[in-house]
Amino acid sequence: MDVSKYRKDFPILNTEDGPTYLDSACMTLRPQVVIDAINEYYTKYPACGGRSVHKLSWQVTEGFELARDSLRRLMGAESTSEIVFTKNATEGM
């Protein structure tokens, strides 16, 4: 398996002395596509999804549900109700 094609997705790993990162209990490295999505959320959709009735909230909720369905298909789940987002592994357990 050629990991170099995956490493290029993570900006920090493309520095001259790109680290070997072993502190995933503290923070998970994010690929550029995730960094871009987070930046887009904070600049265009600064709202809480699933609990407010204004347009921005609806857009956030729709984005979450699209992500949930993408994960459902990727994982082979029968229903999106099987896909649950939590803030960390401890909470998820």
Specify the residue positions occupied by each region the protein language model found.
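Pyridoxal 5′-phosphate
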Residues: 1-93
